[in-house]
Amino acid sequence: MFGKAGLGGLMKQAQQMQENMKKAQAKLAETEIEGEAGNGLVKITMTCAHEVRKIDISPDLIQEAADDKEMLEDLILAALKSARDKAEETANKTMGAFAQGLPPGVGDFFR
């Protein structure tokens, strides 16, 4: 089905694709996104590899939530989910580019 040259070219192409994927994954591990809740009262910064780097809670919210621990917890959770969703979206867009042109289903292995 493949000649020596065809198979060799295919292997070289696969190796190049793997190297490019590793570079993209490394870049995603450093790419920071921000999720927020409560109109910016709670902000969470995380990488596209889901490493939380920063949690910022507005001083105004801390005063308001002094007697409402549950509200503060809900806002932190909502900001975390927002950040996670943005990280997933960014990662899927980046890694999805590697799946273009592959047979159906094969691209799922690269996500």
Curated annotation (Swiss-Prot):
Organism name: Neisseria meningitidis serogroup C (strain 053442)
SUBUNIT field: Homodimer.
One Pfam family matching this protein: YbaB_DNA_bd
Residue stretches spanning the membrane: none
Keywords assigned: Cytoplasm, DNA-binding
Protein name per the record: Nucleoid-associated protein NMCC_1355
SUPFAM superfamilies in the record: YbaB-like
Domain of life: Bacteria
Family: Belongs to the YbaB/EbfC family.
GO terms under cellular component: bacterial nucleoid; cytosol
Function: Binds to DNA and alters its conformation. May be involved in regulation of gene expression, nucleoid organization and DNA protection.
Compartment(s): Cytoplasm, Nucleoid
Lineage start: Bacteria, Pseudomonadati, Pseudomonadota, Betaproteobacteria, Neisseriales
HAMAP family the record matches: DNA_YbaB_EbfC
GO molecular function annotation: DNA binding
InterPro entries reported for this sequence: YbaB-like_sf, YbaB/EbfC
